[in-house]
Amino acid sequence: MKEIIFPKSLKKGDKIAIISPAGFVEEAPLQSTLNLIKSKGYEPVFGKHTLGKFTNGYNYSGTEKERIQDLNWALNNDEISAIWASRGGYGCQHLLRHLKLSKFREKPKWYI
């Protein structure tokens, strides 16, 4: 059986990536999340398409390519210590086949 590897504990000053891997989200409802993150001493960092809008029968935060770019950026960026999905749900399953997990396996992160 493989050993479970947990991410390191977060410390003040760590960066938390805010991404939207599924539906779009407005900035105003995210404000309480940003306030919470900042109040704990962490630095929220938005993905390039976190507040994007793309409609294709469903209101996504971006095209599939844009959403996977944000997710892979957050997973593989050494400066990011945790990932906070602004919302999840429908649309996320389309991204799984595009995940690039090489760095993530070496340095796992909390996914919230």
Where are these regions (language model features)?
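ATP/NTP phosphate-donor binding region
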Residues: 1-79
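Short, glycine/charged-enriched secondary-structure capping and boundary segments
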Residues: 31-33, 97-101
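General beta-strand structural signal in soluble alpha/beta enzymes
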Residues: 44-48, 84-86, 111-112
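Long, hydrophobic/aromatic-enriched structural stretches that serve as scaffold segments
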Residues: 69, 73-99
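Short, acidic/small-residue loops that bind anionic groups at enzyme active sites
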Residues: 99-112
